[in-house]
Amino acid sequence: MNLNSIPAFDDNYIWVLNDEAGRCLIVDPGDAEPVLNAISANNWQPEAIFLTHHHHDHVGGVKELVEKFPQIVVYGPQETQDKGTTQVVKDGETAFVLGHEFSVIATPGHTLGHICYFSKPYLFCGDTLFSGGCGRLFEGTPSQMYQSLKKLSALPDDTLVCCAHEYTLSNMKFALSILPHDLSINDYYRKVKELRAKNQITLPVILKNERQINVFLRTENIDLINVINEETLLQQPEERFAWLRSKKDRF
C-alpha cells in the first residue's frame, strides 16, 4: 500500500491509499479538482471514499467524484448521510477496502458524529487529532474530546497519524508557550519549523513520537500538571484537558 497526501485549500490534506494494482481509497475529499488531477496523473481507480465528519472542507468534493466514478462506495458517519455517504458506519464496525479491514472509531468532540478509521499502521483521524494539537470543539464537550483522544493514543506505537490539516507549526508554538523548557517539544518545534520553511509537509507522524510532544496527550504528565497548578488546581485529567483547550482557543 502507498500513502499519498494531496494538498487542498489553504491547509487541508486529502489522503489517498493505493495498492499495486492502482486501486485507491480517498479520505475526506473536500475538493474534487486536486483529487481528479492526482487520479489522472497516477492512473488510479477509485474504489472508496472515507468521510470522518460533515464539515464542507472534508466532504465538498464527494458529489463530483461520485459523478465521475459511480462505482465508488462512500463510507461515513450518520452525520454525513446527506453529504453523499452510501454506507453509514459506526463505532466498532469495519470497512473492508483494498483488501484491508479498517476499524471505525467514534471520536466525538470536533463534531458529535466524528469518526476515525484505523488499519495498522494507518490512522485517518480527520479533525480529532493533529500533530501537536487537537480539533476545536464545535459541537462536542471537552470530556468527549478527551475520551476520543485517549482512544487514539492507545493505538499501537507505530501508528501513522494522518491528520487532515497542516497545523503542526502553530500547534508547537502553543506547546512551547505551555512547556517552554521541554526538550522533546523544543526539538520537534525546530524540525517542524525547518520543514515548513521549505513548504514541506509535516505529516504523517508516528504515534509514539506524538505522545511525547502533544500536550493534549500529556494531561497526566507531572511537568504539565505543575504548570497548570500555578494557575489553578485541577485534579482530573479531563479538567486539565479542558484548561488546555480553552488556552489554545485564545492563543
From Swiss-Prot:
Catalytic activity entry: an S-(2-hydroxyacyl)glutathione + H2O = a 2-hydroxy carboxylate + glutathione + H(+)
Enzyme class: hydrolase
Key words, A-Z: Hydrolase, Metal-binding, Zinc
Any GO molecular function: metal ion binding
One annotated GO biological process: methylglyoxal catabolic process to D-lactate via S-lactoyl-glutathione
Cofactor binding note of this UniProt entry: Binds 2 Zn(2+) ions per subunit.
Residues engaged in binding Zn(2+) 2: 57-58, 127, 165
Residues involved in Zn(2+) 1 binding: 53, 55, 110, 127
SMART domains, A to Z: Lactamase_B
Pathway: Secondary metabolite metabolism; methylglyoxal degradation; (R)-lactate from methylglyoxal: step 2/2
EC number: 3.1.2.6
Cofactor(s) named in the record: Zn(2+)
Subunit structure as annotated in this protein's UniProt entry: Monomer.
Role this protein plays: Thiolesterase that catalyzes the hydrolysis of S-D-lactoyl-glutathione to form glutathione and D-lactic acid.
HAMAP family: Glyoxalase_2
Family (UniProt): Belongs to the metallo-beta-lactamase superfamily. Glyoxalase II family.
Classification via PANTHER family: HYDROXYACYLGLUTATHIONE HYDROLASE, HYDROXYACYLGLUTATHIONE HYDROLASE GLOB
This protein's name: Hydroxyacylglutathione hydrolase
Species of the source: Escherichia coli O81 (strain ED1a)
